[in-house]
Regions:
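Carbohydrate-interacting regions of secretory-pathway proteins
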Residues: 671-919
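Extreme N-terminal leader/targeting segments of oxidoreductases
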Residues: 1-42, 61-67, 663, 667-670
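FAD cofactor-binding and catalytic pocket of flavoenzymes
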Residues: 389-392, 398-543, 600-605, 615, ...
């Protein structure tokens, strides 16, 4: 029995128990052997936050043959099942943050230590990097991101559609005013021309198939990547719908495309594929819950044996101390496991599965940039001391951030129609900017949020909490009225890479668990104390970004008087009609609106990717140079950051790394040959073929089949069950399949043919036969196959039926031909009646085949033509083969002319099946 849901002071932790396992449960499961296979972990993902969850989910969904196990280790607890803004307003955001050692003047708070991490409370802004922002990125990687992975990640987080939850007169008027203002370059010289920007994702990715892993987890197919077809052209009518225009609107196509570029690229899915609920604002937790549910469903129960069948386990509240490595003879470093400390402060080692078939297990570091770097340094400071470790922690980059909040009269919005509408409305817009500094373009953008057109009432805070992208701006937005609109222009700008004043090192002063914590130093550009060449560029970039905010603010004010909110000291500063950008800057100087560097929590770069091991830390797939199997899946990989939030790019890289691990690194099922000529596969070892099979058996019996490593493996200790191919019945056929037993003393199973649908009531004659033998078909419909079809037996022990009488003796003796491997079960085969000296009747012509040997694949060829049955048994290793039985059916009630095919799960007798073919 597994750990039950625990009672806290206020709640019953059913969701945490559903999602998570204890460390002991995970370690115990790894010691179990299932179908002759050890069940150690093939991939250990360190970090259950945003990118760890994405990576692990992708690994799970990519595994088409169910061949590997994934373990997620998270130091924080489980707190929320989805993004905080998808839930009722509770007056704030979750704050399970843990600080790290840092430069004393910067005061970092740390990231969310919880399953889902930053994705539980982020703002959702997800613009894509421009081509020019991929500074120092490997070209092959950039090409793959643009050709495939940005589309996939956009679909996954919900940024590939327009924001149809942000609409209304306010939004339309603000967008039009901004569009008109940016149309004159002199008005906003720091803005990039809309014509020079790529189309909105809703246009770029229109018509492309869904890649969202939530849909895949719900049964929409495997997670394997497929080529992306060219996007069809979006019609003018569709553009009008995306923009909220009337069908009669005459705006030109080029203007509509440019207007869409001003739409905020928010990770909010309000519409989904048919049959799938939208997830609203993206968080990695719902997807993790989906795959955890799938893993639990596959396991068929609770407890150690069931946990061993689980392909994914999540263990929270576990601190990873370091990664265990060994240096090979070729000087490459291989990871063999991880060392952790459990909730009882006991250190334990979780080993990785050993190499198999030329492939190996892997560890994926998926923490935030700071903690990923700490773990990498603590692990590799010696083994990679003269190599990648000497660069780890350098290239720390984050974002420059400023906030300008203004309140304008609604009369400033020249295209806002007169209306009696009084609903509280919100708007979200996006402007990209750049400035050429030191001979190179430096990029930034504005995230524009607005609210207004109604007086705020007692529920307005809760309403705005749901409507605005950034909950940090909630207080500012509460200044909106029915006569005024509040607008916050948040500037986000890139920092220059490879700044020697920005780095992470292991703290010389502070340690936890005898291991140094991360000490963070980030160039202090805000106060100007850092004067490196990179910092001086960043100062100019920050000025240009703030200048763009002023330019856009003046566009919105449209010559009307307005207020600056939350200026120095929290004051409100009135601005006169006709104010200029120079006057705005004088009234609210740039330094007064700037946040400290790093407060965006967009830290990145410290384990950056590159093709040259001498100048980077990881390769283009995130593997740490000179290691064989240690990967990173986090923004720490970014060579440069650009201005976008790292979410979209981080998700894309996580998917790409998971795809590589699936295709080229992790252990997998042995590749099987294609079906023989003329045969079609009923089960070919893939998830797609497994979905066509259905289980019949006693409810909640725990007797079933696990799909593992491309095989169907029986398990359980209850009444037998039946797994059958559901889509089709068969008349005359040649069925070929392979099976393997594991215990010579317990190897009972069988192959059923020509039986009726077990979910449909049998004809009276068969129901009466079942009743006569004391069988309740309603309690276990698997018995339907016994009475309506025929079973080709698997049991070299030929165990007798304890409930059967054999010519006056009970129980039935062991060893009868009619109960032996290769026989049609229970059809008389001329067996000796030892107590009478006579023989049973001989209805089937049975001859024993080659012995069934544990661990050896045996093959059945079952040929059925009309009422004629012929079975051949072959030892696939020795080649020994024998026709074991020939049988002509004369029972008109059994063996329907068109029947189903299935395999049996017998109590306490594990048997594996593969390559189930038919012609």
């Amino acid at each position: 029995m597994g750990l039950v849901a625990e009672n806290t002071t206020f709640t019953l932790d059913t969701m945490g128990r559903f999602l998570c396992n204890t460390l002991q449960e995970a370690m115990d499961s790894a010691l179990v052997t299932v179908a002759g296979r050890p069940r150690g972990f093939d991939a250990i993902v360190i970090g259950g936050g945003t990118f760890g969850a994405v990576t692990a989910s992708r690994l799970f969904l990519n595994d088409a043959t169910h061949s590997r196990r994934i373990l997620i280790l998270e130091e924080g607890p489980f707190t929320l099942p989805e993004h905080v803004q998808n839930m009722p307003f509770q007056g704030g955001t979750p704050d399970p943050r843990v600080p790290w050692d840092s430069h004393p003047s910067l005061g970092y708070f740390g990231l969310l230590y919880t399953i889902g991490g930053r994705s539980l409370a982020w703002g959702g802004w997800s613009p894509q990097l421009l081509d020019q922002e991929f500074k120092n990125w490997p070209p092959s990687l950039v090409a793959e991101l643009k050709d495939r992975y940005f589309q996939q990640s956009s679909d996954q987080i919900g940024v590939n559609t327009s924001n149809d939850f942000i609409y209304g007169h306010l939004h339309t008027a603000l967008r039009r005013q901004l569009f008109d203002g940016l149309g004159t370059p002199a008005i906003a010289p720091h803005a990039i021309s809309l014509a020079a920007l790529p189309d909105h994702p809703a246009v770029r990715f229109a018509g492309m198939g869904a890649f969202g892993d939530l849909a895949l987890a719900a049964g929409a197919g495997s997670g394997v990547s497929v080529p992306i077809p060219p996007a069809p052209k979006v019609s003018d009518g569709q553009l009008r719908i995306l923009l909220g225009f009337k069908a009669s609107d005459s705006t030109s196509r080029s203007d509509m495309l440019d207007l869409l570029k001003l739409e905020a690229p928010l990770a909010v899915q309000s519409r989904a594929e048919p049959g799938v609920f939208p997830f609203n604002k993206f968080s990695a937790v719902p997807e993790l819950i989906k795959v955890a549910r799938a893993a639990a469903g596959e396991s068929g129960g609770i407890g150690t044996e069931a946990n061993a069948r689980k392909r994914l386990m999540i263990v929270p509240k576990i601190r990873v101390l370091d990664i265990i490595t060994e240096t090979q003879s070729d000087n490459w470093v291989r990871v063999t496991g991880v060392r952790v400390k459990d909730t009882d402060n006991i250190e334990k080692v979780i080993p990785l599965s050993p190499r198999s078939n030329g492939h190996q297990s892997a560890v994926v570091i998926s923490l935030g940039a700071i903690e990923s770097t700490r773990l990498a340094l603590n692990t590799f400071k010696t083994s990679l001391g003269g190599r990648a470790a000497q660069r780890m922690g350098k290239n720390l980059i984050a974002h420059l951030r400023s906030n300008l909040t203004i309140r304008i009269p609604r009369t400033s919005l020249t295209s806002l129609p007169a209306s009696t509408q009084t609903s509280l409305q919100a708007s979200a817009l996006f402007v990209k900017g750049k400035s050429n500094i030191a001979g190179e373009d430096r990029f930034f953008h504005l995230q524009i949020t607005a609210a207004g057109l109604n007086k705020l009432g007692v529920d307005s805070e809760a309403e705005l909490f749901k409507k605005i992208p950034d909950t940090e701006q909630l207080e500012s937005m509460l200044g909106a009225t029915d006569t005024h609109v509040v607008i916050t222009l948040r500037g986000i700008g890139e920092m220059t890479p490879q700044n020697p004043d920005s780095f992470i090192r292991l703290s010389p002063n502070r340690a936890v668990d005898s291991r140094a914590v991360a000490e963070v130093s980030l160039a202090d550009v805000k106060t100007g104390t850092s004067n490196t060449a990179q910092s001086n560029i960043d100062k100019q970039t920050w000025d240009a970004m703030d200048a763009l905010a002023d330019e856009v603010a003046i566009v919105f004010a449209a010559g009307q008087p307005f207020d600056i909110l939350q200026a120095a000291g929290g004051k409100t500063v009135p601005m006169a009609a006709g104010s200029t950008t120079a006057q705005l800057r004088a009234a609210h100087p740039f330094p007064n609106r700037r946040d400290a560097e790093g407060t965006t929590h967009h830290d990145a770069g410290t384990l950056w990717m590159g093709t040259d091991p001498a100048t980077s830390v990881t390769n283009e797939f995130g593997r740490i140079h000179d290691t064989t199997n240690c990967y990173v899946s986090a923004p720490a990989l970014f060579p440069s950051l650009g201005s976008p939030n790292p979410m979209l790019t981080g998700v894309a890289l996580s998917r790409r790394t998971a795809d590589l691990l699936e295709s080229s690194v992790l252990p997998r099922a042995v590749i099987r040959s294609a079906t023989a000529a003329g045969f079609a596969a009923l089960f070919d070892g893939t998830a797609d073929s497994f979905k066509k099979w259905r289980l019949a058996g006693a409810a909640n019996s725990g007797q079933a089949f696990a799909f593992l490593a491309g095989e169907l493996v029986s398990y359980g200790s209850s009444d037998f069950s039946l797994l059958y191919f559901a889509p089709q019945t068969f008349t005359d056929f040649h069925l070929r399949l392979q099976f393997k037993v594991f215990d010579a003393a317990n190897c009972n199973s069988g192959v059923f043919v020509r039986f009726r649908n077990p979910l449909v009531k049998l004809p009276d004659v068969l129901t009466q036969r079942a009743s006569a033998e004391g069988v309740n078909l309603d309690s276990n419909p698997a018995w339907s196959a016994v009475f309506s079809g025929f079973e080709v037996q698997i049991d070299d022990n030929a165990r007798g039926d304890v409930s059967k009488d054999y010519y006056g003796r009970k129980p039935e003796p062991d060893g009868l031909f009619k109960n032996r491997t290769g026989a049609i079960y229970k059809i008389p085969a001329g067996d000796l009646i030892t107590h009478t000296g006579g023989h049973d009747v001989r209805i089937q012509q049975y001859n024993p085949g080659p012995a069934v040997r544990p661990g050896v694949w045996m093959q059945y060829d079952i040929e059925v033509t009309g009422n004629h049955y012929e079975v051949t048994l072959t030892d696939t290793e020795s080649g020994a083969s024998q026709i074991t039985t020939v049988f002509d059916n004369t029972d008109a009630a059994r063996g329907a002319s068109a029947g189903l095919i299935g395999i049996q799960s017998y109590p306490n007798a594990p048997v594996a099946f593969r390559d189930i073919w038919i012609k």
